């Protein structure tokens, strides 16, 4: 007893978490139920945590799990997995379970004796509500024999934390839970349920009202869903495992890579049902639809002009302020927008990626190429409503319209010019 007490007080023995303590295991059957995205997420989480624990000097030089993870093509399950299950009945009794968990129903199939360590707790056990049999689709009242049959099916999917006895249902959040046992967290939330490393992380108004329930332990940012929190936490690791095969740019999330690759492929899967315009990102389509409903909520206080989008409003204000925040490091020229600087940079690099399919001439931008191609088709789609004259480019039409303004006519008369359309 004295030895145990001494070990508990020894600071060198407290707060350590080994890689194997935060490793999630799957049986072959469970692994087979995961789709490609879920398997990729599992792989990312394991590799990131191996890197994190390694940086603390707490991981083995070569973990069996890490070796298995490097093989992307093989669906695997570690042969040395030895884990114990928790039945739903044990989970309902609360979090104060002692010792190892065991299957309560003796009729459980031997395959159900495999379970997995846990990550994320979900309160899904509501008293008095009927439980639905996930395999047969039947609903059972609490305590019925059919409900006991359901316990057999889910026995292998309920897990228990070996440190505090909490029971969980899912296998993708144990890292979040176990870290609470391994880090010093002196600042406790006023509700008494959570602790943080920094006092600035505590924001009980948002967390306990349900507005945001999942908080990042590094920066205190809160999220409504654990999946969004996991995506955010990759920012702090600095790991960017997803690399673009075309330009070499790396990303910390696979979905970010997919969006980026649409730049190279030209894929624009989101189409506006009103005008047929397509977009590569769904959020851009949502913003675009405001054009059709006539929403213009942003007003410039300098000139009274209205804008549909906040970013367009900000760019417009630079006309009044003269701000040109994007400067070319090569020649010092400044630009209002980042895209303007990017187009200018091609002057220095000589890059002309847009080629005319009719004559082979190349251009720095897609719009320049499209404008050039109109010369081949002799398309004149911009017509003056005053005189009916047609032009190939909208900019030429705008320049022409000045001829019809009273100021321009007065000026031409003063110089003895004859205005003709």
UniProtKB/Swiss-Prot annotation:
Main subcellular location of this protein, as a coarse class: nucleus
Pfam families according to UniProt: KRAB, zf-C2H2, zf-C2H2_4
Biased composition (Basic and acidic residues): 120-129, 404-415
Region of interest (Disordered), residue spans: 120-146, 402-421
Gene Ontology CC, one term: nucleus
Protein keywords: DNA-binding, Metal-binding, Nucleus, Repeat, Transcription, Transcription regulation, Zinc, Zinc-finger
Record-linked InterPro entries: KRAB, KRAB_dom_sf, Znf_C2H2_sf, Znf_C2H2_type
SUPFAM superfamilies tied to this protein: beta-beta-alpha zinc fingers (SSF57667), KRAB domain (Kruppel-associated box) (SSF109640)
Cross-referenced CDD domains: KRAB_A-box (cd07765)
GO biological process: regulation of transcription by RNA polymerase II
Domain of life: Eukaryota
Domain KRAB: 17-88
GO molecular function list: DNA-binding transcription factor activity, RNA polymerase II-specific; RNA polymerase II cis-regulatory region sequence-specific DNA binding; zinc ion binding
Zn finger (C2H2-type) location: 159-181, 214-236, 242-264, 270-292, 298-320, 326-348, 354-376, 382-404
Compartment annotation: Nucleus
Primary role: May be involved in transcriptional regulation.
PANTHER family per the UniProt record, alphabetical: KRAB AND ZINC FINGER DOMAIN-CONTAINING, SIMILAR TO ZINC FINGER PROTEIN 84 (HPF2)
Family: Belongs to the krueppel C2H2-type zinc-finger protein family.
Name of the protein in question: Zinc finger protein 584
Species for this entry: Homo sapiens
Gene that produces this protein: ZNF584
């Amino acid at each position: 007893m004295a030895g145990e007490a001494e070990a508990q007080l020894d600071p060198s023995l407290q707060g350590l978490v080994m890689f194997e303590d935060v490793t999630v295991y799957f049986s072959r059957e469970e692994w087979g139920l995961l789709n490609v995205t879920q398997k990729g997420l599992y792989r990312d989480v394991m590799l990131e945590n191996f890197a994190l624990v390694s940086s603390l000097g707490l991981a083995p030089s070569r973990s069996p799990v890490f070796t298995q993870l490097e093989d992307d093509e093989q669906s695997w399950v570690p042969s040395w997995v030895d884990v114990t299950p928790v039945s739903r009945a044990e989970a309902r009794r609360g979090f104060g379970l002692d010792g190892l968990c065991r299957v309560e129903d003796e009729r459980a199939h031997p395959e159900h004796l495999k379970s997995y360590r846990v990550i994320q707790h979900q309160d899904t056990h509501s008293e008095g509500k009927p439980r639905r049999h996930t395999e047969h689709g039947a609903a059972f009242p609490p305590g019925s024999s059919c409900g006991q049959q359901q316990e057999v099916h889910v026995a292998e999917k309920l897990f228990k934390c070996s440190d505090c006895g909490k029971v969980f249902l899912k296998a993708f959040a144990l890292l979040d839970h176990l870290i609470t046992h391994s880090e010093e967290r002196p600042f406790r939330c006023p509700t008494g349920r959570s602790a943080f490393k920094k006092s600035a992380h505590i924001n009980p108004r948002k967390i306990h009202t349900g507005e945001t329930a999942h908080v990042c332990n590094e920066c205190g940012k809160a999220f409504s869903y654990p999946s969004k929190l996991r995506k955010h936490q990759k920012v702090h690791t600095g790991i960017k495992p997803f690399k673009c095969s075309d330009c070499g740019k790396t990303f910390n999330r696979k979905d970010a890579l997919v969006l980026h690759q649409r730049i190279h492929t030209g894929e624009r899967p989101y189409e506006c049902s009103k005008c047929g315009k397509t977009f590569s990102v769904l959020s851009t389509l949502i913003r675009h639809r405001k054009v059709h409903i006539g929403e213009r909520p942003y007003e410039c206080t300098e000139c009274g002009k209205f804008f549909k989008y906040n970013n367009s409003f900000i760019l417009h204000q630079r006309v009044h302020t003269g701000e040109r925040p994007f400067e070319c490091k090569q020649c010092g020229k400044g630009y209002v927008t980042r895209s303007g600087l990017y187009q200018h940079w091609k002057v220095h690099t000589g890059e002309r990626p847009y080629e005319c399919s009719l004559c082979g001439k190349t251009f720095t931008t897609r719009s320049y190429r499209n404008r050039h191609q109109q010369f081949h088709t002799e398309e004149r789609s911009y017509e003056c409503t005053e005189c009916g004259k047609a032009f190939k480019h909208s900019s030429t039409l705008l320049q022409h319209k000045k001829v019809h303004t009273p100021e321009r006519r007065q000026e031409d008369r003063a110089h003895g010019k004859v205005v003709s359309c």
